[in-house]
Amino acid sequence: MLSRPSSRFLSTKRGPGPAVKKLIAIGEKWKQKTTRGLPKQDTLNSGSKYILCQFPYPSGALHIGHLRVYVISDSLNRFYKQKGYNVIHPMGWDAFGLPAENAAIERSINPAIWTRDNIAKMKQQMQSMLANFDWDREITTCDPEYYKFTQWIFLKLFENGLAYRKEAEINWDPVDMTVLANEQVDAQGRSWRSGAIVEKKQLKQWFLGITKFAPKLKKHLNQLKDWPSNVKQMQKNWIGESVGAELVFKVADPKFENLIVFTTRPETLFAVQYVALALDHPIVQKYCEEMPDLKEFIQKSDQLPNDTKEGFQLPNIKAVNPLTKEEVPIFAAPYVVSSYGSAPSAVMGCPGHDNRDFEFWQTNCPGEHIKTCIAPFFDDASKVTEQERQRIIDTVPFTSTDGVLTKECGEHSGVLTVVARKSIMGMLNSEGLSKSVVRYKIRDWLISRQRYWGTPIPIIHCDNCGPVPVPESDLPVKLPELEGLDTKGNPLSTIDEFVNVACPSCGSPAKRETDTMDTFIDSSWYYFRFLDPKNTSKPFDREIASKNMPVDIYIGGVEHAILHLLYSRFIAKFLGSINAWSDPAGIFEPFKKLVTQGMVQGKTYVDPDSGKFLKPDELTFVNDSPDGNTVIIKSNGKVPVVSYEKMSKSKYNGADPNECILRHGPDATRAHILFQSPIADALNWDESKIVGIERWLQKVLHLTKNILSLEKDLAISKDYKTPTDLNDAEVKFHNDFQRFLKSITESFEVNLSLNTVISDYMKLTNILESALKKGEVRNEMIVQNLQKLVTVIYPAVPSISEEAAEMINSQMEWNQYRWPEVERTTESKFKKFQIVVNGRVKFMYTADKNFLKLGRDAVIETLMNLPEGRMYLMNKKIKKFVMKFNVISFLFHK
């Protein structure tokens, strides 16, 4: 057994060989030029392209997932620049947030210092991978020059009634001591950031009225033709449109207001047996003041599972069914969602026709009778036995929306549910007890965070005036500089000089808002700021934004389908509604085409006995295995279980992109990332396979050198056109080259199949190499197509392209950046004809494709004069002669 080198086992990795060292050196040689981009190309495409990848949080280190996104966006950026477009390809930093604050606490420094240091490191890493970003457009969300306008947007939302403060039940992260939006709590009830079990608290919070835009957010998804269907479906599900009715349940106690209950099935009113209220409902809160048992129930409710069926019946209070006038009990129930936004805070319970209500009733009222009001409908055509019919009728709950109302439903008895639904609504509408509405599951966006490192909310609280917006002339409300953070929670509330201010309205002593904004607000509008980053008077110029929006291609992870993408759509639509930008389509969508790249997964090794994840130094190779590549566990000689999983420190399967670039060079790393997987699919990272890419890059350089050595004085005019007098080999060479050139162009422009781009590059290289070896294609054509190859590889492997172009430029002048036009395929002027004698092919003859038009006698005479013709055709009497397509047939007398 012998340890052998592998990228997975860095401790045993040998250094690169001479050929790979050359690739690394070429990357370093051209780094400055390639990261600056390329000259503007003058072509027919004078329009613009806005290509944007989701900007990163400045953690200080890029991971392979980052690298994948940036290689995709940079390749598209370079391609469209070569096509002559004015490409906007900016980069910035999503710099506020908990990680920086927590890091600052650990180091006792200001988070701004930690953030700036990390940005400098990550910019250097981006340059190492040859990324060409518009650094003159760079933005950082923690800069006052940026968050000044985040605050401006908040004030506009406040001005339009879309930013408001109210007490609500919130998700509290006990580790980070801050509030989380619903989207930041996972299915297990844990914080997306700290992993802590989230608690429920009542707290005054700031919300943004995203629910007001819910109809447009849902409707306009249908017009996003270039978005992945799974992302659109996730947003539709999150928005959650329901068409139904708001019903008025009067409360049998005059000191309480009526209950507004939303339902999609008013026909089940005949079977309502209770009403359930959210824990923050005013009635529940009123009872809570007088009932310690209820208060304890609410306090413990955050420990219950999300689908809990526990409830607390409120004493001495009933709700009146608007249809039957029957009084039913009222429960406080954790399963009922809170009241902010468009979500209901009161629901009616029908145990006989809803599974959840059935379980709730059995939990809280065990053994009590269950009402039903809908029975299955069997028409004459129903092929159901009487026994089966009875079984269906006796099943409780009966949850089908199709059926007939039972005899207990008075004048509605025997009526189909769909008919009864309309008639019941008509009756209740006439009494003012119902109205048809569309409700949405989405709730208003909770943006308050009780932390320091975020955008301050520009509101001042005055005892006389209430919440007062900070005047625009006083923006930005700057974060006070702190040398070190030594506590969790909200340090802003402890800084008197920040908190204590005069009211802008009346001048009285007042208090500044100490909550900061959710960082998703910072990233909800950054794509606008990139277009006009130096503007000091407004977030962006209306004309500039209207000209360049929406973003043409937006690249990022599917994990942001609900959070960032939904919030960005909301803010873009809001800014459109206040005329901050115009959209000819009238839908104000920020991203035209969305590209969601798959996750990069690392090779993971697990001990088959213990299930323990194995570190690289716990593994070795077997050199006498059939493939010479079998990994075993050093301690016991067993073969580990191998799989590809999400990269993480705990699984020891991470990969450092900077190390990969140092070992293989930037071009090989870039091409390897593109080649390994289609963009939307997961990428199983295996650095050992990069050797194929390295060989191809070396072949490109060797091929360039060999082709240019054909004739030292060979020069190709800039206006060189493919000749028309091509031989068969040249026709095939030309057609094959154009076929792959077309495929590459379409892969960039149409289907973003960048993995096939790399394979097509390799095929073009092989076509040139084959033509050079065979010597059947004239040198000028080979050189011309070498130039095209060097040009089209530039988006993916820019420094190798530059190196090859430098060799070519030493002998001739040409535009190495302009993307070549795909030429039409051509046909040979010659054709191969089969010469058939008495039913058997005797020989082939290549002639002008119009050879048969010479006529019978001329064709026969020509063939007779050939050596093969004299052998097979001379001195024989023709019985039948046929010329058709590429066949010339002789039938001779015996």
Curated annotation (Swiss-Prot):
Catalyses which reaction(s): tRNA(Leu) + L-leucine + ATP = L-leucyl-tRNA(Leu) + AMP + diphosphate
Motif 'KMSKS' region per UniProt: ranges: 646-650
Temperature-related properties: Optimum temperature is 37 degrees Celsius.
Cellular component per GO, a single term: mitochondrial matrix
EC number in record: 6.1.1.4
Keywords of the record: Aminoacyl-tRNA synthetase, ATP-binding, Ligase, Mitochondrion, Nucleotide-binding, Protein biosynthesis, Transit peptide
Keyword Aminoacyl-tRNA synthetase among record annotations: yes
Binding, ATP: 649
Gene Ontology molecular function: any one: pre-mRNA intronic binding
CDD domains per record: LeuRS_core
Protein origin, superkingdom: Eukaryota
InterPro entries: aa-tRNA-synth_I_CS (IPR001412), aa-tRNA-synth_Ia (IPR002300), Leu-tRNA-ligase (IPR002302), Leu_tRNA-synth_edit (IPR025709), Rossmann-like_a/b/a_fold (IPR014729), tRNAsynth_Ia_anticodon-bd (IPR009080), Val/Leu/Ile-tRNA-synth_edit (IPR009008)
Note: PubMed:3034607 authors identified this protein as the gene product of the NAM2 gene, which is capable of compensating for mutations in mRNA maturase encoded by the fourth intron of the mitochondrial cytochrome b gene. Present with 2120 molecules/cell in log phase SD medium.
Protein's recorded name: Leucine--tRNA ligase, mitochondrial
Gene name of the encoded protein: NAM2
